[in-house]
């Protein structure tokens, strides 16, 4: 014999997920999403060197659904494949247009999901996006989580090598929150190392965060990588 507690919030969460996934497929088919571009600024020159593509799902009432709500559903349903391809095409086209407007050194960064590697078509998708936009591959940067780099059972490594052979660059995203395996930095030639905002937001508060950030930057420098600090939103930081 046993008893369980019932919480109406469980039903509310499940209802919300069910409603979203029912709306997600037609939204993907109709390209109802928008891509915003967050600038990455060189602190030495105070100039924009790159932009990061951020996906949003606008609603008819003017509100916005953020990725943490719909990306997990897209991953579990397989819709991340067409959605991810659409984002890549949008980002490459945006960057190519910026080059035409005189911003010839601008790079665009796009986040990748581990689920995008599952069907083995990602290298072809990346190549097609570059061809469609006529963007030179060195101006596309794909951001990889440590979960992607840790995959040893699938074809992820082969696909990454195929993409790298196109001339596309990589960045390691959210460094310090996953496996943080230094071996990845030695064996995988990424151009950038992105320090997770959890370390940046507490600079000046937590006594260990400053030395940790400095150590990560030093590692990146020694390996010829650029360090990117996420979440800098004030002058003291």
Tell where the protein language model's regions lie, with residue ranges.
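Bacterial c-di-GMP phosphodiesterase EAL domain
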Residues: 8-135, 147-148, 161-162, 175-177, ...
């Amino acid at each position: 014999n046993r008893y369980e507690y019932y919480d109406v919030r469980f039903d509310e969460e499940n209802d919300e997920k069910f409603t979203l996934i029912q709306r997600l497929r037609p939204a993907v088919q109709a390209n109802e999403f928008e891509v915003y571009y967050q600038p990455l600024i060189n602190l030495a020159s105070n100039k924009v060197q790159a932009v990061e593509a951020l996906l949003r799902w606008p609603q008819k009432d003017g509100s916005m659904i953020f990725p943490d709500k719909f990306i997990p559903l897209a991953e579990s349903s397989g819709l991340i494949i067409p959605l991810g391809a659409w984002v890549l095409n949008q980002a490459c086209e945006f960057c190519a247009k910026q080059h035409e407007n005189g911003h010839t050194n601008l790079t665009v960064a796009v986040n990748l999901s581990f689920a995008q590697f599952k069907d083995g078509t990602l290298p072809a998708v990346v190549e097609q996006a570059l061809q469609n936009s006529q963007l030179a591959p060195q101006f596309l940067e794909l951001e990889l989580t440590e979960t992607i780099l840790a995959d040893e059972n699938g074809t992820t490594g082969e696909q990454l090598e195929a993409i790298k052979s196109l001339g596309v660059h990589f960045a390691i995203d959210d460094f310090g929150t996953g496996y943080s395996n230094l071996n990845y930095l030695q064996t995988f030639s990424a151009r950038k190392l992105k320090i997770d905002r959890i370390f940046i937001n507490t600079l000046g508060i937590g006594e260990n965060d400053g030395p940790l950030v400095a150590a990560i930057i030093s590692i990146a420098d020694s390996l010829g990588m650029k360090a990117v600090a996420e979440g800098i939103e004030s002058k003291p930081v």
